[in-house]
Amino acid sequence: MVNGFTKFKERFQGFENQYVIIGGTACDLIMENEELPFRATKDVDIVLIVESITAEFGRQFWEYVKEAGYEHLNKSTGNAQFYRFTSPKSKEYPYMIEIFSRNPDFIILEDDAVLTPLPIDDEISSLSAILLNEAYYELLKTGQMMVDGIPVLSPTCLIPFKAKAWLDLKERKLNGEQVDSKNIKKHKNDVFRLAQLITANTRQVLSSEIAEDMKKFLSEIADETVDLKSLAVNNSGLKIRNV
């Protein structure tokens, strides 16, 4: 589990319908719950459910950030917002929290609050595009599950999100954009890690748009080399190619 996540969980009890954990932390919590290994991760990726968000959550979150003493407070610009908080005063708090909101005004800031501009890297740009897509946002809202009292995106929904991120970053790199190849590989490998949780009875309803993205992913991934042994993934990971 991510360092400091226990305190985060305790602080936001009662707000479980207002946010969902995605990304590596969601994968880590799910895999740990199934007693399966996952890669190390130090950041917590949070998406706010704008239809449910309350001013009280925003106040509580800002109080939590101040309590943690995060050294770096960053905010992106634009209609949708990314906030990044890094380097807390102790390991009782996650090293990094990244929070995404389709509504830029969810946090109630104090007058003396200083948030520096957040550089838009490939990961932020890609995730923003995915979450602003209505089909993926609807999947996020309907595809949650609770793991030890924490709302996370379920494995069958994390896989399409990871697949879409892989397709998006791969295309951006082919088009000449500056994209870290490690991020592309990370999403691909995570799909195979999560595929261990897929059974013959697993079902997930997808919109036509997301279904087409998954078909494209499965077609393109067939040409990729994946070292399942190094990922500590058993051969059941191969089933993703046969979905």
Q: For each of these PLM feature ranges, what is it?
A:
Residues M1-V243:
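Compositionally biased terminal segments of proteins
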